[in-house]
Amino acid sequence: MYILELLLKGNPAPIVVHQKEEEAANRAYQSVVNALQSGSPQSLELTCDRTGKKVFLLTGELCGVQMTTKSGGPGAPGTRPGFLAQLQG
């Protein structure tokens, strides 16, 4: 499972999108990066494979994106990769 975390301006909690396939996760990540690099606000729709839910947002409100891999094994308690883990440290 691949996880995309999208950070919105003024919102401390990320929007999380799960993708089962690495290729689909890379495509979604690249579409967010391309939209951010364009410099002009665009609309973007992403689908979460885990729940089948969709999110639609304006890229002008995004300030970052991160892609991580979720392994099947248990992680260390109380730790998590990503933006929020860096802020808590």
From Swiss-Prot:
Please name the InterPro entries in this protein's record. Answer: UPF0367
Residues in the signal sequence: none
Region of interest (Disordered), ranges = 69-89
Q: Which domain of life is it from?
A: Bacteria
Q: Which family, according to the similarity comment?
A: Belongs to the UPF0367 family.
Classification via HAMAP family: UPF0367 (MF_01360)
Q: What is this protein called?
A: UPF0367 protein CYA_1023
Q: What organism does the UniProt record list as the source?
A: Synechococcus sp. (strain JA-3-3Ab) (Cyanobacteria bacterium Yellowstone A-Prime)
